[in-house]
């Protein structure tokens, strides 16, 4: 993938108890170098599919015997349905376009309720029929409140509420109604180390702290990870406790442009996060932008570091993969990591995991 495509993906353009811990002080470069030296790199296996479909397979969601993969650059449809775990193609939906019911820029999909997000239009769509032998059908079309500013990721708190990172910088999260799209409330603060910068340039800070989010299956914790910094945050929905984990690569680094935009200036860090009943799984890169630019067309997008953490933020295991991946799905019962390699022609890859 070329660097101009990278930039398109990067910029489609206080609580009761708080704790911040500096847990992992080893840089991402050192982690990868050590794994290579010891011969401890986890080797992946390509999962073949029977049709040439993907251009930029970015997110994978699995529910029961079906999987949906979001492809950001597909010419016709954003979402593709497969059987799971054998990945037999079934159907596609989420037509790319500017017409009614079409999507300009798809951002994510969540199986609970079968909702998808179109940041380009500021809308959410709910589908039925996402299964083998069926044709997906759009059932609801919700226009999101304009006060949400930008909507680049989301997760569902319950059947009536969606959480979206707050890109205005006023808060960390926005909560909206799934029936009306109305903004219900905002919560938390961006935990930037320079509060004065947040006061002066809140939207730029929010862009520099662009985050991916994931609820635990029981909805008791909400986890966010930063795209441009080594920062993981865990928010308890019941106790309002907040745990912040700052890794060895530091918090997001960015520059404020004359126009007020937050331009990343440090590293590309987290690519995806998945929370299960037991663990938090994240895929991490850590390369510096200045080094990425030197690679030019040889640059491969994605992260090679899989971190497995407890719900309290303690890292219990770190894997180094043999290739970078952008999106992840961990099947704990099968002991398998499925990753999406956007640099290859065959983009679904699986890795064996040893989970306790």
Segment roles from a protein language model:
Residues 47-77, 281-285:
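Beta-strand-rich domains and repeat architectures in extracellular enzymes and scaffolds
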Residues 282-300, 348-351:
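Short, conserved, GDST-rich strand-edge loop motifs in beta-rich repeat architectures
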Residues 122, 129-160, 165:
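Asp-box/WD-like beta-propeller blade repeats and closely related beta-sheet repeat scaffolds
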Residues 250-258, 312-330:
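Conserved blade-ending motifs and adjacent loop-strand segments that build the rim/top face
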Residues 28-54:
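A short helix->beta-strand "capping" segment at the edge of beta-propeller domains
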Residues 88-115, 120, 142, 322-325:
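Blade-loop segments of beta-propeller domains
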Residues 58-62, 107-110, 152-158, 205-218, ...:
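Structural signature of eukaryotic scaffold interfaces centered on beta-propeller domains
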Residues 175-177, 296-313:
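Beta-propeller blade signature
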């Amino acid at each position: 993938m070329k660097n101009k495509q990278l930039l398109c993906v990067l910029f489609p353009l206080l609580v009761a108890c708080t704790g911040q811990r500096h847990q992992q002080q080893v840089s991402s470069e050192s982690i990868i170098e050590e794994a290579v030296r010891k011969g401890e790199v986890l080797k992946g296996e390509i999962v073949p599919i029977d049709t040439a479909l993907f251009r930029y397979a970015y997110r994978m969601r699995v529910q029961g015997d079906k999987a949906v993969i979001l492809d950001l650059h597909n010419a016709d449809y954003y979402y593709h349905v497969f059987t799971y775990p054998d990945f037999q193609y079934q159907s596609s939906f989420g037509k790319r376009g500017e017409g009614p019911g079409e999507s300009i820029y798809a951002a994510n999909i969540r199986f609970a309720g079968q909702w998808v997000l179109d940041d380009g239009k500021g809308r959410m769509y709910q589908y039925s029929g996402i299964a083998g032998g069926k044709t997906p059908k759009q059932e609801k079309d919700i226009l999101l409140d304009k006060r949400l500013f930008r909507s680049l990721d989301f997760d569902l708190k319950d059947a009536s509420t969606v959480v979206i990172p707050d890109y205005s910088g006023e808060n960390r999260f926005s909560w909206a109604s799934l029936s009306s799209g109305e903004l219900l409330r905002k919560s938390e603060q961006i935990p930037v180390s320079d509060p004065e910068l947040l006061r002066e340039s809140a939207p730029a800070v929010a862009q520099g702290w662009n985050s991916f989010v994931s609820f635990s299956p029981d909805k008791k914790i909400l986890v966010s990870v930063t795209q441009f910094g080594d920062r993981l945050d865990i928010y308890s929905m019941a106790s309002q406790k907040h745990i912040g984990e700052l890794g060895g690569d530091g918090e997001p680094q960015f520059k404020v442009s004359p126009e007020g935009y937050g331009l990343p200036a440090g590293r590309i860090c987290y690519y995806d996060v998945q929370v299960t009943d037991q663990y938090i799984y994240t895929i991490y890169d850590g390369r510096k932008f200045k080094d990425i630019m030197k690679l030019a067309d040889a640059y491969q997008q994605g992260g090679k570091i899989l971190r497995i953490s407890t719900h309290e933020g303690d890292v219990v295991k770190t894997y180094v993969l043999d290739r970078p991946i952008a999106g992840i799905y961990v099947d704990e019962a099968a002991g398998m990591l499925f990753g999406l390699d956007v640099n290859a022609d065959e983009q679904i890859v699986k890795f064996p995991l040893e989970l306790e």
